[in-house]
């Protein structure tokens, strides 16, 4: 009996030891996997590093590319497009002006009544219209007729105090956010469609002429006096209220910058210099590229798999279209190599662009003790119902690294513009303010991105110079900015002044 008991005890002890060994191996495996997660995070943090020295190199590279782009066509990754906007709004404008904002699957029509410096914008009305999918791939005539019909309906709703002055034609600012070769303030040929549009017979045509023909067909007596993109519109909107505005930056789904340049510094300009001595330059800075940019394997893979490999590298590192996707790629690697979410990679995590930047922002801003928002996004967006607090903290860390890098190199880009304009140093006895107008959903809604960008710019400038540089939100530049440019380039300006 005693032998049997001893035998049973030995068997039992062996079983316990075996179970303990399995548990130890599991813990070691788990510990090893977690170590791999931390190694991937550290590697990401190192590769995304933005020390001040590197950011200053990025800023200097931006300034060099700006000079090259102004010297001759094709000499720089920056197009440095001449906008033909040589008169920015001053606040003196008065009268009724319209704007049309076409940049996606919806377009807006807007009218403003301007009352000069005392009253500024007296009244403002707008309407938003969806474009039927079939018109995005139809003919040029069909699309512009549809837009002209909407304009006609909008004009018909003018109230008693919102009519143009007697014997004056209505004037329109046209924000057209597609690649255009501008040939004057009110003309430009379409280079190519983007954003789901594919209307072959518009390519190579003057989009203002196409709209004008459609307005004639639909009985709309209106003249396009300014063709602009949303960034130039934002600059105009900012300058209308503050004469110290020198540049505008869009940080949204995409990104771009425009600024006011001395006309004499634009060496590729062959026409007579404008009377104002100034010209707004549309930088198209999303295409900026430099060896100093902190690119990672995730950025390189994203670029290679994109519709435009090798192009828009800066935009792919800082804009709302791509930030969430970079985070997804990092999380996918952690899931694949270190089982971050369990033994199998969640199927939804394999889907490109499933994690949008607003989702990333929501997780990044989660201040709840158990990171409930992160848990909710994992479940609702990525189909991951269960996650530990430890895993959720890692996800917030990844969001922080990617957002901080984007914000810091955005600040370096802005510094590049400030340097080009010679506003990065203080001249003796001068304390001139320089205002940068910012717009776009990323800047407006992603608070941690915005705060990091502003802090980084201050650090790059130094306390004294930072006091003279102001970042200001300029809302709805693509709408009201276009109407203001229609006013500042009105055909009736000389009559009004005489």
From Swiss-Prot:
It is found in: Plastid, Chloroplast outer membrane. GO terms for molecular function: ATP binding; D-glucose binding; fructokinase activity; glucokinase activity. This is Hexokinase-1. PROSITE patterns: HEXOKINASE_2 (PS51748). One of its GO terms (cellular component) is chloroplast outer membrane. Gene3D superfamilies: 3.30.420.40, 3.40.367.20. PANTHER family: HEXOKINASE (PTHR19443), HEXOKINASE TYPE 1-RELATED (PTHR19443:SF16).
